[in-house]
Structure formats: structure tokens, C-alpha cells
Regions:
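Glycine-rich phosphate/pyrophosphate-binding loop regions near the starts of catalytic domains
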Residues: 23-36
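C-terminal binding/interaction regions
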Residues: 233
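Conserved mixed alpha/beta catalytic, RNA-binding, or beta-rich assembly cores of soluble enzyme
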Residues: 1-24, 39-42, 46, 51-209, ...
Length: 265
């Protein structure tokens, strides 16, 4: 999902516990998953993150058979009392409980029970890390991007939010239409390079551009993911170049360099 038109950007960080990253245990000892939700800081409204989390938990986690919902950020200074809001699904049969040494809400459901921590913490993260893959054809650009995503998946604290981790419709900020905030990046559309109204910017021979977008817990996580993706994909056949969208520095103050030796320490 993209915050261009969605309520947040969400994705799977990693599986944890049995069968996953066993350095992280779940409160109930079962297999689990860490999920990240992000909204842009320029929205300046944490309540939008709370609403997005409420909708996603209520519709995607509460409904999932045998699932529970735990707060990973126990030390976070900021938090939402989301457990109480989700618990209203219990229609007055819900109740406060303590389990696994945690303060939780208990909701009776047809499958048995759903339990959830009373509070979910939140903190600043990083959005919009990206890589562009310039291919001789669609197959090469897509194959390179797929290799990049595969390398990112095992890295902790990072998510890729688009289908399969890849965007085939990379956008620019702004539009000629006032009802949307982003639009196709015509300078980099292969089929518009000969359009006289477009100032084409694609290198010679490029016929497809695929993009990976990364969000994460912090700068170091995104840097690690970026370098892993580049290393895994750079030798792809018919891949002509790897670059990234800078957007004239308008979308944020954090800069990640594709050449690791140029990244400030």
C-alpha cells in the first residue's frame, strides 16, 4: 500500500519465533510476524496512524483464525490505547485480562478467543528508501528487482510495501490534476521518450524501469537493505543501470547513497 491514496504503508517485517527469526520470541511462544505501519511525517497527525492501525487490526488480524496481537514496542514513549477500541467488537462481552505477564483485552469470537495488548507503541521511522532498475526489457528490469527484494526480505526492521515488493509505476510528486498528489514520471516512461512534449531522461537502450520502495525502523536498516539489494541484483543479464529517485530532495532530509563508500558515517 502507498500513502499516496492509502491510509498508511504497511508490510511484513519478518516472521519470528518457531520457524522464523528465533532471536525474537513471541509472548505466547507460537510462530509470529512483525508488521510495520507507516504514515508520512508531513501529515503531522499521529491519529491517522492510530486509525489506520485500528482498521488493519480489526479487519486483517482479528479475522485471522487463532491470531493474537502483541505490542513489540514496550519501551515506546508514545502509544495508542488500541486494545480497548478493537475490543468493542466483543459487544459488552469483552473484558480486561492479564496473560503472559501482560495487560490485555479478551474478546470472545466464534473461533474461540482473540487477545490483544491494551497499548501499542509507536515511534519515528523512515519512509521512501528506493532503488530503480533500468532494464533492456521488462524481463530484465523485473528480474533484477525480484533479486533485490529477495535480498531485502531477511533483513530485520525493513518492509517493502508494494505487490511483491516492486512498483512498476514509479511516480513523481505532483500532478496536473488537483485531486491527486502524485502522477506518472513521464521523463522516465520508455514509451514517452519520443513524445515532443516530454523531456526524456532515460539512458539509451532502457525499455523498462522497476522500483523497490523500502520503509524501515531507522536509517541503518534502510542502508543495509539498500546495499544488500544492489549486491544481489547488479549482475542481472540485460540490467543496464541501478539508480534511485531523489525527487530534488523534496521528500525528506535523509539521503542514502548507492555507493557505500560515499555514505556519511
Amino acid at each position: 500500500s502507498s500513502s499516496i491514496l492509502c491510509d498508511c504503508e504497511a508490510g511484513l517485517d519478518r516472521y519470528v519465533g518457531p520457524g522464523g527469526d528465533e532471536s525474537v520470541s513471541t509472548p505466547d511462544g507460537r510462530p509470529g510476524a512483525i508488521i510495520q505501519l507507516h504514515i508520512p511525517k508531513f501529515w503531522k497527525d499521529p491519529k491517522k496512524l492510530e486509525k489506520a492501525a485500528l482498521v488493519r487490526i480489526s479487519q486483517n488480524i482479528l479475522t485471522c483464525p487463532t491470531a493474537s496481537c502483541f505490542n513489540l514496542m514496550d519501551d515506546a514513549e508514545s502509544y495508542f490505547k488500541l486494545g480497548k477500541k478493537v475490543a468493542f467488537f466483543g459487544n459488552k462481552y469483552q473484558k480486561r485480562i492479564e496473560r503472559f505477564g501482560r495487560k490485555m483485552w479478551w474478546i470472545p469470537i466464534l473461533g474461540g478467543e482473540f487477545i490483544m495488548d491494551r497499548r501499542l507503541g509507536y515511534a519515528d521511522g523512515l519512509m521512501g528508501g528506493n532503488l530503480w532498475y533500468f532494464g533492456k526489457n521488462t524481463e530484465s528490469a523485473l528480474k533484477a528487482a525480484e533479486k533485490g527484494v529477495e535480498a531485502i526480505l531477511p533483513i530485520p526492521n525493513v518492509i517493502t510495501t508494494f505487490p511483491g515488493g516492486i512498483a512498476g509505476s514509479g511516480s513523481k510528486a505532483g500532478s496536473d490534476y488537483d485531486f491527486t498528489i502524485a502522477s506518472t514520471y513521464e521523463k522516465f516512461c520508455p514509451l514517452l521518450q519520443k513524445d515532443p512534449s516530454v523531456e526524456g531522461a532515460l539512458p539509451e537502450g532502457v525499455n523498462s524501469v522497476m522500483e523497490i520502495i523500502m520503509n524501515g525502523k531507522d536509517m541503518d536498516s534502510i542502508i543495509t537493505a539498500t546495499q544488500a539489494a544492489i549486491e544481489a541484483s547488479k549482475e542481472t543479464e540485460d540490467l543496464l543501470m541501478i539508480s534511485a529517485g531523489n525527487y530534488n530532495g523534496k521528500l525528506g532530509k535523509s539521503f542514502i547513497y548507492l555507493h557505500p563508500d560515499k555514505q556519511p558515517s
